[in-house]
Design a protein with these regions (language model features):
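Structured core elements
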Residues: 41, 65, 76, 157-159, ...
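TRNA-binding/sensing appendages of the translation machinery
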Residues: 1-83, 138
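Beta-rich nucleic-acid/ligand-interaction surfaces
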Residues: 44-60, 161-171, 252-260, 348, ...
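Acidic, His- and aromatic-enriched active-site or binding-groove loops in soluble protein domains
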Residues: 62-70, 174-197
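Short, basic, helix/turn surface patches
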Residues: 65-77, 185, 278, 363-370
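Positively charged, Gly/Ser-enriched RNA/tRNA-binding surfaces
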Residues: 20-35, 46-47, 82-95, 101-153, ...
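Extended alpha-helical scaffolds
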Residues: 151-155, 163-166, 177
Length: 370
């Protein structure tokens, strides 16, 4: 076996991609900060009791597990930031009003989450806690769109759903308790033959006409009427140039802990969603404090692959000399934001690899960029 081979769907990030990802990370986190979102950094490892609290079986299956050599307890490598950020909000911050939090870090999945996905995404996202009104959902969807635009994604298609509709219908299905997981995945995968009485949901996807069809074809239940109204209002308030909005009533969320409105963003050239989010009001309950919550997450690696290529790095090659004036000139250039690379002796034949388009040379007694 070749020792340099990596596991399937695990890849190194090389300099050009890493530079693009870092530019995006800084730009998006700056955008979040400008909207009042505070950065948090949960640990990569936690005991599974807290890491998986309040989540569904899908997240459990996606989580790598190992035994802690210090305590003997089972630990998990996070597969999603949301439960961790919910724990921070509920147990550590303990704020009474609205909390706006954001994050960026690696997660690890036992299997890829999509056709083009890696098993080690770098998640970046934002979450809003403490407000149950539609205003919170509007804010995070608009922020998600703004983040995608900041990443250079010109065309965005938003798919809206609401699992509350599925749950209201499932309660009236006699076999639902015994077939809960089977029904959930049948609807999510649009398998009408396995969805039984819920099969109608698999056909309700498309433009604004879907809401009117749903009002005609779905049971006349107050919860369903309210959920459809929320979808309609959210779509209206998130309309923007370059953004298309559609509805998918079979969209039930990512890891099966969404409790209300869900949304996913797509763009031409990517078969998988480039951002996902939704309501998850009950995740904090296992930490003793259920709070209204909504948010979204994106994969920096995926965004970097779709975003326009960043400008080619421009650098200045400086000689490796012990001279105070040279060192001062290099320091001034770096302070001004220039990249200055020292030309170490013995590597003259490999200078092209340094990607320097200018030189720092001494002319008429002064160090100048040429």
């Amino acid at each position: 076996m070749r020792r340099w081979l990596l596991p399937e769907h695990i890849e190194d990030v090389l300099p050009a991609e890493a530079r693009a990802m870092e530019r995006l990370r800084r730009a998006i986190l700056d955008l979040f900060e400008a909207h009042g979102y505070e950065l948090v950094a949960p640990p990569l490892l936690e005991y599974v009791e807290s890491l998986l609290s309040g989540t569904g079986r899908d997240l459990d299956l996606a989580t790598f597990k190992l035994v802690d050599q210090l305590s003997g307890r089972m630990m998990g490598v996070r597969a999603d930031h949301t439960p961790q950020v919910a724990r921070i909000d509920a147990h550590l911050l303990n704020r009474q009003g609205v909390a706006r939090l954001c994050y960026c870090g690696s997660v690890l999945h036992t299997v890829p989450a999509g056709m083009t996905k890696m098993r080690e995404p770098i998640q970046i996202g934002a979450e809003l806690y403490g407000h149950e009104g539609l205003e919170a959902d509007v804010e995070v969807v608009r922020l998600m769109i703004a983040a995608l635009k900041r990443a250079g994604i010109a065309r965005v298609h938003i798919d809206l759903g609401n699992p509350a509709i599925y749950r209201a219908m499932a309660q009236g299905e006699p076999s639902a308790p015994e077939r809960a997981e089977e029904l959930f995945h049948a609807v999510q995968q649009k398998d009408a033959s396995a969805a039984g009485a819920l099969a109608v949901l698999t056909t309700l996807n498309g433009g604004a006409e879907v809401i009117e069809r749903a009002r005609r074809e779905l049971p006349k239940l107050p919860r369903i009427a309210e959920a459809l109204g929320q979808l309609e209002r959210l779509a209206r308030r998130c309309a923007a140039p370059g953004v298309e909005v559609s509805f998918d009533l079979a969209e039930l969320g990512g890891f099966n802990y969404e409790s209300g409105l869900t949304f996913a963003a797509f763009t031409p050239g990517s078969p998988d969603a480039i951002a996902r989010g939704g309501r998850y009001d009950e995740v904090g309950a296992s930490f003793g404090r259920a709070r209204p919550a909504t948010g979204f997450t994106m994969d920096l690696r995926q965004l970097a692959a779709l975003a326009p290529a960043p400008p080619v790095r421009r650098a200045i090659l400086a000689p490796a000399l012990e001279e105070a004036a040279l060192e001062e000139a290099v320091a001034r250039l770096r302070e001004a934001g220039e990249v200055v690379v020292v030309d170490l002796p013995g590597h003259e034949g490999a200078r092209a690899e340094l990607d320097c388009d200018r030189r720092l040379e001494k002319k008429e007694g002064k160090w100048r960029v040429t």
